[in-house]
């Protein structure tokens, strides 16, 4: 078990790719905190992991709220004693051309996909430092690298922002053993 003794927090972990990530991490021995706005699905994923012999905790999380992140990371550390891994998985998509994109549409995608990982990373770093280091995994997309008419400008911009957030954070916190 490659992750035995480690504690992972996965945003958007209630269903889909995030739930799969949570189960994989648990299968490798990590205790897993599942943060999501989808409480019923999150509790179901938590139960599946716990019933299969893993350790999981569901915590409510609105990735666009700094206080929600602080509460979720705090609950994780209170339950498991540390934080070693953060997976910023929560995300939303959008389609359409820029001239038909409302400011609210733009803000929603940017808040979840870019601000969310920023706030999660900010909340996780102090706890990772206490643990002697950690790993931050930000889920992006190939659409963060290339433009296409098949997606939306706000989605592609948000995924490009995640890539540079990841690179900058890794460089700034490498001396702390956080990558």
Per-region residue spans from a language model:
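Residue(s) in the substrate-gating loop at a strand-loop-helix junction
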Residues: 141
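Active-site helix of classical SDR
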Residues: 121, 158, 166
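Active-site loop-to-helix junction immediately N-terminal to the catalytic Tyr of the SDR YXXXK motif
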Residues: 101, 147-156, 168, 178
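Canonical Rossmann dinucleotide-binding motif of NAD(H)/NADP(H)-dependent dehydrogenases/reductases
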Residues: 3-33
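Substrate-binding pocket helix/loop in short-chain dehydrogenase/reductase
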Residues: 97-98, 105-107
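The beta1-alpha1 cofactor-binding region of Rossmann-like NAD(H)/NADP(H)-dependent oxidoreductases
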Residues: 39-40, 61-71, 103
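Alpha-helical segment proximal to the catalytic Tyr-Lys
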Residues: 126, 171-175
């Amino acid at each position: 078990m490659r992750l035995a003794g480690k504690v992972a927090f996965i945003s958007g972990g209630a269903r889909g790719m995030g739930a799969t990530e949570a189960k994989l991490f648990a299968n490798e021995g990590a205790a897993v905190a599942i943060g999501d706005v989808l409480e019923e699905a999150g509790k179901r994923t938590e139960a599946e992991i716990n019933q299969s012999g893993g350790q999981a905790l569901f915590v409510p999380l609105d990735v666009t709220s700094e206080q929600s992140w602080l509460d979720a990371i705090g609950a994780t550390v209170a339950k498991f004693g540390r934080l070693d891994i953060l997976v910023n998985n929560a995300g939303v998509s959008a389609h359409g051309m820029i001239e038909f994109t409302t400011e609210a549409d733009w803000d929603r995608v940017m808040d979840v996909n870019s601000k969310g990982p920023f706030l999660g990373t900010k909340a996780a770093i102090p706890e990772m430092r206490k643990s002697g280091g950690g790993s931050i995994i930000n889920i992006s997309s190939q659409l963060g690298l290339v433009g296409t008419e098949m997606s939306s400008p706000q989605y592609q911009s948000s995924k490009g922002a995640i890539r540079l957030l990841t690179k900058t954070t890794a460089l700034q916190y490498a001396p702390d053993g956080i990558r």
